[in-house]
Design a protein with these regions (language model features):
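Sec/Tat-exported extracytoplasmic proteins
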Residues: 37-40, 53-58, 95-98, 112, ...
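Mature N-terminal segment immediately following signal peptide/propeptide cleavage
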Residues: 27-67
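Bacterial N-terminal signal peptides
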Residues: 8-19
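Solenoidal tandem-repeat scaffolds enriched in leucines and small polar residues
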Residues: 173-196
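Conserved active-site tyrosine of GNAT-family acetyltransferases
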Residues: 46-51, 108, 146, 177-182, ...
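Vicinal oxygen chelate
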Residues: 24-28, 31-42, 66-67, 84-169, 190-194, 198-213, ...
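N-terminal secretory signal peptides that target proteins for export/translocation
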Residues: 1-6
């Protein structure tokens, strides 16, 4: 069984490696993961992690909103003490792709940040040790306020120093969760499903949505108020898309509107059945 587990992990590592470059922004993709909204205790502490350590770019958006830009994604920072880390919600971590995982991981540790595991053990199981990169291909980091980040290897020639790669969920109902996201965003099942992992690909983008099984006994809570408050999907034809969601039986938490405070982009909000808040936008990709 241990050998099967090692083989599965290696297979996942190879998938991560070969798929990374596909996440460069496809301007024609109907749906992309466009941003994450973080509640942070300190803007400056987060800049030291996201900018000084990982290599993002600090910028301002709209009425003085602090934003960190990476190729493929924005992180919106709101200075408001979070109610908890990403752990404990069905949102597990943000995935980035880099050319040299061990090198950047060493920098992260040298700058005082911690490492963690990919999947947490269940009752009576032995925890995996903190990782400096399984097979040197990927590692899991913990930033300020308990935001979990994964680094995966990008071996494509000319790969940027860092780029957004995927979003990863963890849930006891991980298969049902994957099916909900396929339904909502017209994603497709990805090959390589295991007894603890399943993925979904966004149209025109490919590798993006990953789902782990959640083994700990503790119940999970919603993302609102947590370190990662919500995930943002950028959608072409957003108003019509919201009507399609409603026709699928997916209710809007907040109806479609134009947001003048954000440059008049289109905005709507939905919440998945496990409490993950999802902001839908149209217009953010034009700022890249």
């Amino acid at each position: 069984m241990a050998e099967v587990g090692r083989t599965a992990r290696l297979a996942l590592a190879l998938i991560f490696t070969t798929a990374a470059h596909a996440q460069l922004l496809n301007k024609d993709a109907p749906v992309i993961v466009g941003h994450y909204h973080l509640n942070v205790t300190s803007i400056e502490a987060h800049k030291k992690f996201w900018v000084d350590t990982l290599g993002g770019t600090a910028m301002k958006f709209g009425p003085g909103i602090d934003v960190i830009r990476f190729p493929g994604v924005f992180l919106f920072l709101r200075e408001q003490k979070p109610t908890g880390p990403t752990r404990g919600t069905a949102f597990d971590h943000i995935g980035f792709a880099v050319p040299d995982v061990p090198k950047l991981t060493a920098k992260v540790v040298a700058n005082g940040y911690g490492l963690t595991v990919g999947r947490e053990p269940g009752p009576g199981q032995t925890a995996s040790p903190p990782t400096a990169g399984n097979y040197g291909r990927f590692s899991y980091l913990v930033g300020p306020d308990g935001v979990k980040v994964e680094l995966v290897t990008n071996e494509e020639p000319g790969a940027p120093p860092i780029m957004h790669h995927h979003v990863h969920f963890a849930n006891k109902q991980f298969v049902e969760m994957q099916q909900w996201y396929m339904k909502a965003f017209d994603a497709t099942l990805r090959a390589g499903q295991t007894d603890y992992f399943i993925g979904a690909d966004l149209p025109g983008v490919g590798y993006m949505l990953n789902f782990f099984s959640w083994l700990p006994e503790e119940a999970q809570t919603g993302t609102k108020g947590r370190a990662v408050d919500h995930i943002g999907f950028e959608v072409r034809g957003l108003e019509a898309f919201t009507h399609k969601l409603e026709a699928k039986g997916i209710k809007l938490t907040e109806p479609y509107r134009k947001a003048p405070e954000l440059g008049n982009i289109g905005v709507a909000v939905i919440t998945d059945p496990w409490g993950t808040v999802i902001e839908l936008t149209e217009g953010l990709r034009d700022l890249r």
